[in-house]
Amino acid sequence: MALTVKEEEFSNTLIKNASAFDRLKLGNLKNLKIQKKLQFLYLILFVLITGVFFFFLIGNFYSHRKLYQVIKNTKHTTIGFKIDRPHDKVLSSVLKNKLSTYVKESFKFFKSGYAQKGYLGSENDSIELDDVANLMFYGEGQIGTNKQPFMFIFDTGSANLWVPSVNCDSIGCSTKHLYDASASKSYEKDGTKVEISYGSGTVRGYFSKDVISLGDLSLPYKFIEVTDADDLEPIYSGSEFDGILGLGWKDLSIGSIDPVVVELKKQNKIDNALFTFYLPVHDKHVGYLTIGGIESDFYEGPLTYEKLNHDLYWQIDLDIHFGKYVMQKANAVVDSGTSTITAPTSFLNKFFTDMNVIKVPFLPLYVTTCDNDDLPTLEFHSRNNKYTLEPEFYMDPLSDIDPALCMLYILPVDIDDNTFILGDPFMRKYFTVFDYEKESVGFAVAKNL
């Protein structure tokens, strides 16, 4: 039977629509398969990311749990403290002020050969290297029968204890915990006026006596109530610490006062007149101060001692090797208040030039490529022992600026022509004992807890 024109048009349209529908159906099936593949890939990616995240969490938890168990089970007083790292502030400032390109281009400029040698700094630089070398270990202690809390810097380079007084009218004191003698029943008046000078300024006040508490230890102790801290600005206002607890030597103190640890031993509160620092490798912003004894779970291998060569500082004799550059019988100061290894400028400039290390102009950053195979293991030789510091301990990648670039935790500081400071990088690798009775410093490789 023949179709009419309208019926034929309808039939053709139906066939075309059916064909189009088949193509659409086929296309949808293909899209569905692609979607399923993508969903499967997303699932795999999610599982991988989640797995890595949980692996990190579990590993971190296990690591912290081991450390927690050591601290929980130790028979010695151990105080956790925070570490205020000046390099963190420098890098934060670089990012905040959008100087990342400036850092990268500075390195490229001096590497390109346009300059005769890498820029190693000058006295006109806008940020003092001494400022970025300053490190703060600060933990909590209390004063008085009512346990007034204070955040102390634990400082091996000074010997007095001071806190701001309620009578302090300096700008910085307005944000601090202030000592109120009238609130403590164990307060004893002294009133002798005193001032202490630091590299960053002078504080003024008067002597008082009250009960000092550190962890589960307490003792009556003569300290300084500070009434004027203006000279410490702007550092004081911008930092979390309230006062300083000196862990140096008596001859370094104002008023000829025994250090807290020595006084604790005299009062039979601890077994030994010593303290130790343990700085975990996995977390550069915390550390642990132990008073009166040595916790063997913080280190591995032998614990070796070096006799002091100075009656004011924790200073020892070492032959120091920076690759081919050697300083015989150098004075090495072991210092909790220094964020880097420091060396005399004339010694360090030669080393940096050979190692293709440059200083970023107007910033306290010494930079090289992270794959710089020329960087040596630093060696520190005593008469009977050798201590080493591999590049991984004295350099860190500038991840937020350029992952290919690393900064060095080595700075030029001129105390004299043969004095080095072994600060945070050295003490992070080596568990360190400061022993008043042996007049020695002890080192052992720190465990990675």
From Swiss-Prot:
GO biological process: acquisition of nutrients from host; proteolysis
Enzyme class: hydrolase
Major place of residence: membrane
Annotated EC: 3.4.23.39
Regulation: Inhibited by pepstatin A.
pH dependence comment: Optimum pH is 5.4.
Domain Peptidase A1 stretches: 137-444
Recorded catalytic activity of this chain's protein: Hydrolysis of the bonds linking certain hydrophobic residues in hemoglobin or globin. Also cleaves small molecules substrates such as Ala-Leu-Glu-Arg-Thr-Phe-|-Phe(NO2)-Ser-Phe-Pro-Thr
Assigned keywords, A-Z: Aspartyl protease, Disulfide bond, Hydrolase, Membrane, Protease, Signal-anchor, Transmembrane, Transmembrane helix, Vacuole, Zymogen
Ranges annotated as spanning the membrane: 38-58
Keyword Transmembrane: yes
Protein modification: Proteolytically cleaved into the soluble active mature form by cysteine proteases in the digestive vacuole of trophozoites. Proteolysis requires an acidic environment. Autoprocessing or transprocessing by other plasmepsins such as PMII may serve as an alternate activation system.
Subcellular location: Membrane; Vacuole lumen
Active site (catalytic residues): 155, 335
Lumenal side: 59-449
Any Gene Ontology CC annotation: vacuolar lumen
InterPro entries: Aspartic_peptidase_A1, Aspartic_peptidase_AS, Pepsin-like_dom, PEPTIDASE_A1, Peptidase_aspartic_dom_sf
Effect of substituting residue 335 to A: Loss of catalytic activity
SUPFAM superfamilies from the UniProt entry: Acid proteases
Xref: PROSITE patterns: ASP_PROTEASE (PS00141), PEPTIDASE_A1 (PS51767)
Disulfide pairings: 168-173, 370-406
Quaternary structure note: Component of the hemozoin formation complex (HFC) composed of falcipains FP2A and/or FP2B, plasmepsins PMII, PMIII/HAP and PMIV, heme detoxifying protein HDP and falcilysin FLN. The HFC complex is involved in hemoglobin degradation and detoxification of heme in the food vacuole during the asexual blood stage.
Described function: During the asexual blood stage, catalyzes the cleavage of denatured host hemoglobin (Hb) or globins. Digestion of host Hb is an essential step which provides the parasite with amino acids for protein synthesis, and regulates osmolarity.
Family label: Belongs to the peptidase A1 family.
UniProt-recorded name of the protein: Plasmepsin IV
Gene: PMIV
